[in-house]
Regions:
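Alpha-helix N-cap/helix-start motif
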Residues: 49, 85, 111-115, 141-144, ...
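Active-site beta->alpha loop and helix N-cap motifs at the rims of alpha/beta catalytic domains
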Residues: 1-8, 12-15, 19-140, 150
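C-terminal alpha-helical cap/extension of soluble enzyme domains
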Residues: 2-13, 34-36, 197, 204-292
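Glycine-rich phosphate-binding "P-loop"
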Residues: 134-135, 157, 268-269
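Short amphipathic alpha-helical/adjacent loop interface patches that line ligand
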Residues: 28, 60, 119, 155, ...
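A general structural signal for well-ordered alpha-helical segments in protein cores
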Residues: 24, 56, 60, 85, ...
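Catalytic alpha/beta core domains of metabolic enzymes, predominantly
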Residues: 124, 138-242
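Short helix-capping segments at alpha-helix termini
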Residues: 65-71, 94-96, 126-128, 153-157, ...
Length: 292
């Protein structure tokens, strides 16, 4: 399966420390109606690090049910514990997702050989089309393009990478070494257009939580070779992309959705509400972009 276009790294709405199912379903429905290509529950933006395994399963089930087969679902199933990643991937496969988003093990700091062994074990025990997630700033380990090419060759289940190293040269090497049939997806909203210009397929996006039609439109424009329109949308989205990282993701995006009236603001510790001066700056950008 080829994953391409704009996928939303879904926030997880909470209410009284439980998943707010009503708001989660509303958010999923709005995303689909706005033209998003696909959905990614239980990623970093979904606060997966503070969700129990039962909550992971609940969020994935809700997403599958509400989506009802309309767009692909790429479920976050990664862990720094290989056996946990296998169990979550096995559940997601049995539940009926289209693929898994599997982060490189964090904190452990495995070697490149360890990364390969991790993804091989998951594929062997729970085979499912998989996009590996490389985000060195959060994990402390960088999945190198050379290793990624070996993984693609040795593990057919790995069909793509969410590349969030922030290194556009590394993105280019990923496409060069893995081939144009491999789904190299941006893990950072501000590099979507540069990545696609080098053969990347799209993005797993934070900002599409609040501007799904624009991010989907950017990807569609580039895929249809309308570079001018893609460039216009790139610059149109740029202030929002910056605003989503005024503080640690997903604090700004959940705050924005709250300000927009789409859900209540509830974060899980150790994440806390935005500092007042940053929230004020965020509101200014939302007003500028006519989202409030």
């Amino acid at each position: 399966m080829e994953f391409k276009g704009a996928y939303t790294a879904l926030v997880t709405p909470f209410k009284d420390n439980q998943i707010d199912e009503e708001k989660f379903r509303e958010h999923i429905e709005w995303q689909i109606n706005q033209g998003i290509y696909g959905l990614v529950p239980c990623g970093t933006t979904g606060e997966s690090a503070t969700m129990s395994h039962e909550e992971h399963k609940q969020a994935i089930k809700i997403c599958i049910d509400q989506n009802n087969g309309r767009v692909p679902i790429l479920a976050g199933t990664g862990s720094n514990n290989t056996s946990e990643a296998i169990a979550l991937t096995r559940f997601a496969k049995e539940a009926g997702v289209d693929g898994a988003l599997s982060i490189t093990p964090y904190y452990n700091k495995p070697t490149q050989a360890g990364l390969k062994a991790h993804f091989k074990a998951i594929a062997r025990e729970a085979p499912l089309p998989t996009v590996v997630y490389n985000v060195p700033g959060r994990t402390g380990v960088n999945l190198l393009p050379e290793t990624l090419a070996e993984i693609k060759k040795e593990i057919p289940e790995v069909v793509g990478v969410k590349e969030a190293s922030g290194n556009i040269s590394q993105v280019s090497q990923a496409v060069e070494y893995c081939g144009r049939d491999f789904s190299v997806l941006a893990g950072e909203d501000f590099i979507v257009l540069p990545l696609m210009s080098q053969g990347g397929k799209g993005v797993i996006s934070v900002v599409s939580n609040i501007a799904p039609s624009k991010m989907a439109g950017l990807c569609s424009a580039y895929l249809s070779k309308d570079v001018d329109k893609a460039l216009d949308l790139h610059f149109d989205l740029a202030p929002l992309c910056r605003a989503m990282f005024f503080e640690t993701n997903p604090i700004p995006v959940k705050t924005a959705l709250s300000i927009m009236g789409r859900m209540d603001l509830e974060l899980r510790l150790p994440l806390v509400n935005m500092q007042p001066e940053n929230e004020s700056k965020l509101k200014q950008v939302l007003k500028q972009k006519q989202l409030i």
